[in-house]
Swiss-Prot record:
It is found in: Nucleus. Induction: Repressed by epibrassinolide. Its main location: nucleus. The gene is IBH1. GO terms for cellular component: nucleus. PANTHER family: TRANSCRIPTION FACTOR IBH1, TRANSCRIPTION FACTOR IBH1-LIKE 1. This is Transcription factor IBH1. Highly expressed in roots and at lower levels in rosette leaves, stems and cauline leaves. Belongs to the bHLH protein family. CDD domains: bHLH_AtIBH1_like. Residues 90-139 form the bHLH domain.
């Protein structure tokens, strides 16, 4: 089996961190009991998906972005761990109140986007756009790293 260093040759530290955490999670999954029944295979698929998202959130800096905090919090909650939520109260600014008077089409699109981006529920539109751009960048990084892993590990 090829090493991760040979599979992912990059100068982007986020990719390296993602690859490290993702490969470590996959290794831990592999050490668990084999999954033979369809229910167990579905469980394994969910675990791999969760490992990919948690690795991506860690690579993004963990607590530096709202979406990464939301993903990590959701993962902790799924593991039945105690989750501490921020006690900070969010104020609705006058900008947000004014933004509610915008065209309904824009508001509907922003609301759909809030539902797609983890942790996007209470964000103002400008912050939502910033978080969405970073989230998309990290998702594309995740896809590229996973494609490198598949290309490097598949028989030629």
């Amino acid at each position: 089996m090829a090493s991760a260093d040979k599979l992912i040759n990059t100068d982007v530290p986020e990719k390296d961190v993602f690859a490290f955490h993702f490969l470590q999670s996959l290794s831990n999954l592999r050490k668990q009991n084999p999954f033979d029944t369809p229910d167990q295979k579905n469980y394994r698929v969910r675990k791999i998906k969760k490992a990919a998202y948690v690795s991506m959130a860690r690579a993004a800096g963990g607590s530096s972005r709202l979406w990464s905090r939301a993903l990590l919090r959701r993962a902790d909650k799924d593991d039945n761990k105690i989750v501490r939520f921020s006690r900070r109260k969010w104020k609705i600014s006058s900008k947000r109140r004014r933004s509610n008077q915008r065209a309904p089409v824009v508001e509907e699109a922003a609301e759909r986007l809030r539902n797609l981006v983890p942790g996007g529920g209470g964000m103002e539109t400008s912050k939502l756009m910033e978080e969405t751009a970073h989230y998309i960048k990290c998702l594309s990084m995740q896809v590229k790293v996973m494609q490198c892993l598949v290309d490097g590990l598949s028989p030629k």
